[in-house]
């Protein structure tokens, strides 16, 4: 999980409220540290799920203050994108006389939480401190960036460099050409999930047409980008829900 969430019910961790508190639905921070240490002792690295596109709040605009190593970090209403939540946040901000960022979202809007303005120096400082904490304090050896379609790819490169991390993968769920563009826009500082190959395998299995496995419309068959391809199998986004869904 990316950090402690606000909800009292079990959650997968995609609604982060705290960054520097790692107690979660999966266990305590102490248990997490023991797990990472045990894996490391066995020569296995652990990848953190980094959710920084959006952030939960109390009410519309209140972020928690967190103190780590003597420094207090707190996101502000001015760190929220100007067009967050399809403009609903701006309407509420006007009603409460609250100032948002003047910058629109750099990518896709994610409704339900406050989308962060990654051009904000405060946002950048907090996230850089957070990813350093994940690597240097908790002991993670890699990052999986959630919802990277929501902010510019260049920020992933900046955060990786700030942490000194050796491996990261972005969840850029789109066509092969757009995934390739995203990798290029990170300056080839991150890998990406090879979602197109996942669909090649799905279609081959569903239709009994195994020649689809020879498709070159994926990252793994691109000689210049295959080193940045991470095979994607399945997750909670693709689980079976009803006969009408074909994910």
Residue ranges with predicted function:
Residues 3-7, 14-15, 36-38, 44, ...:
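Active-site-proximal helices and loops of the catalytic beta/alpha 8
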Residues 25-32, 120, 124, 226:
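Solvent-exposed, acidic/flexible segments
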Residues 115-130:
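Alpha-helical scaffold elements lining the catalytic groove of polysaccharide deacetylases
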